[in-house]
Amino acid sequence: MSNLFEPIPYSLWKEDKQAFAKRLGSSFRETGFAVITGHPVKQTVIDEANDAAKAFFALSSEAKEKYHDAEGGRQRGYTPFGTENAKGQKAADLKEFWHTGRKLPADSKYRSTMKDTPVVDEVPEFDAATYAFYTEMDEFGRDLLRAVSLHLELPEDWFDDKVESGNSILRLLHYPPQENPPPKGTVRAAAHEDINVITLLLGAEEAGLEVLHRSGDWLSVNPPAGSLVINCGDMLQRLTGGVLPSTTHRVVNPEPERAKFPRYSTPFFLHFNQDFLIEQLPQCLEEGGKTQPPITAQDYLMERLREIGLVKA
């Protein structure tokens, strides 16, 4: 793996917060990505969520389709193969996925726009296993944002109350085997950027993730086993005026000898609270960051979901 993605040990955060924040921020500035080793997400929680996901995707198309909410923007439940496309792309990605969202209290002001995640009847352990994983990724993501705060010379807890009820999503991805050559111009996930604040991604079983460096080269990301890949999303890029970039990335089709194997992936998309107003931080503008009009996290999300075909324009 390129030294641009040199792993950062999470233990450094416990030993020297400023040193960890500096390394994380430097990696984000250079590539928009970072690799973290020794993360606190329990392996048993990861394994149980992955097993539940594989059991769900093994169900019949008819069974999975029961959990498809096309009218709700597909922000919860199942999205079928060939539905989502990258911004500016006509061809749909070669994937299917499931979204697990935050469980809100009954009196939450966000309940009208943040639906409950459907319970999968056919896989009894699915709800508990995936939400346990969601919870641990959410907690770790907030810890990483504390490091981002320090890097941006903000109070360590600056992000805490801005993401505590965020519309964050655990996406369980399944890229099916390619028994036959895929249609011309299609890939598992076309070049795109993430919409959210930061994304946490566990190392995939099958290779394929590539990042577009500012040099114009596509760089393969093959993190050490058990590590997490973290990347900046468009919301963080907008907040920082581009000081922390949301980098274009993709998942390419497998080599012929690996085409018969499926690929599973579990990105966690950490979002702001829906009513948070995204506007550029003054210190980032002083660095030369780009000014953009203020916009709420929810309005920005819906704008982007329309662009990628998950919400009707």
Located regions from the model:
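Peripheral, non-catalytic segments flanking oxidoreductase cores
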Residues: 1-313
